Amino acid sequence: MRKWFRVWMVIALFPAAVFSGDRGDAVVTDERGYFVCSVARSASGVWYTAQHCLTGDKLFVNGRNTPYAHLKGDIIQIGKDARQPDKGVMTADRVRAGMRVKVRIGGLSALTDKPTYIEVETKILAVYSSADLKYQLDAPDDAGWYALIHLGAFGGCSGSGVYYRGRLIGVVSAGIAGEYTFVALIPPAR
């Protein structure tokens, strides 16, 4: 019973967030401007999303072709074609199982046709490298790091931010079994 509580809370609270939520947030779109995925913003103002949200090899933000830097795994940094330093994030090497995190989970409102986000608190159940995970979330030559959280995912929430004490640790990457979600973690700078 308790395991479904979080899933139902997201479903129940989402309509309320439509009318009270953010209206000016950026979103990942296709080349025609149609919504594809959510984006996450670090405390220092840098934007991130999931790599699988790209249209081909291009990133469209609010309908405009936008440069990006591919990080390791299923995560990209938006705005420049090379990785920029970002003090508003916590990298994968510092993320641990048991941390309580906030997920700013988002999607597109069918009522307002605007991005809508709600915050849900959850716990990191485990942290994996791609090799340990043995689940296809990235290419073998592009191995990243992932956290497993107890929160259901839905279409369009990929790219939503996951935060620990106000610092971005990664973005929603994949939902499994309607109850758990993999978070693509921000890799340490090289």
Please place each PLM-identified region on the residue numbering:
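Gly/Ser-enriched beta-turn/beta-hairpin loop segments
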Residues: 72, 128-146
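Bacterial N-terminal signal peptides
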Residues: 8-16
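Bacterial N-terminal signal peptides that target proteins for export
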Residues: 1-8
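Extracellular/periplasmic catalytic domains that process cell-envelope and extracellular macromolecules
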Residues: 41-42, 70-71, 94-96, 141, ...
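Active-site substrate-binding loop(s) of clan PA
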Residues: 79-128
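Active-site-proximal beta-strands of protease catalytic cores
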Residues: 45-51, 97-110, 145-152, 156-180
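Extracytoplasmic
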Residues: 23, 34-36, 71-75, 117-119, ...
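Catalytic histidine site
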Residues: 21-70, 167-189
